[in-house]
A protein has these predicted regions:
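C-terminal non-catalytic accessory extensions
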Residues: 138-159
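A structural motif corresponding to the C-terminal lobe/cap of the Radical SAM core domain
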Residues: 1-135, 158
């Protein structure tokens, strides 16, 4: 069964990331939102960890269940996206699955919030400026200002 990763002792992951960074290696971390047991609170814990670790590169994604994946059979056909565009993380049609506790819409909204929060955090921007220079820093000031358009997050217009 696929589940959210858990580190037995919080300091282990912190010490590991620091040890890697201390050797001059840039860390690329991947964070997933929308596991079946996720709530807004558990996703916030994941974001808090990301902000605390402050790695050089991150991906913030929602859980996607593709045909052939072990988790795919845990869902009924009506729970899965009907169109391949819905599987694309950054597409207008992106459609995360509901968790046991929150809707796919809430997962997508949180994922996009997490992305904006991380890349706008001063701690991260300082890391970029100090490690990669002003040109990269200036780019990072612009990049998160372009929000993704999401069909699922558009307000429904009342006739």
């Amino acid at each position: 069964k696929t589940q959210k990763g858990k580190f037995p002792i919080k300091s282990d992951i912190h010490a590991t990331v620091k040890a890697i960074q201390d050797t001059g290696i840039n860390v690329h971390a991947n964070y997933m939102f929308g596991f079946q047991d996720d709530t807004i609170e558990t996703m916030q814990q994941t974001l808090d960890l990301a902000l605390d670790l402050n790695t050089e590169f991150v991906q913030m994604r929602y859980v996607n269940v593709l045909p052939g994946a072990p988790m795919y059979n845990d869902f009924t056909e009506d729970q899965l996206p009907k169109d391949w565009n819905a599987y694309s993380q950054y597409s207008y049609e992106a459609q995360p699955l509901d968790t046991k506790y929150i809707s796919g819409k809430e997962v997508l909204k949180f994922r996009d919030h997490a992305f904006q929060t991380y890349f706008r955090s001063q701690k991260y921007l300082d890391l970029v400026k100090n490690k990669f220079g002003k040109k990269c820093y200036d780019h990072m000031l612009i990049q998160p200002k372009v929000p993704l358009k999401r069909k699922l997050l558009e307000e429904q217009k009342v006739a």
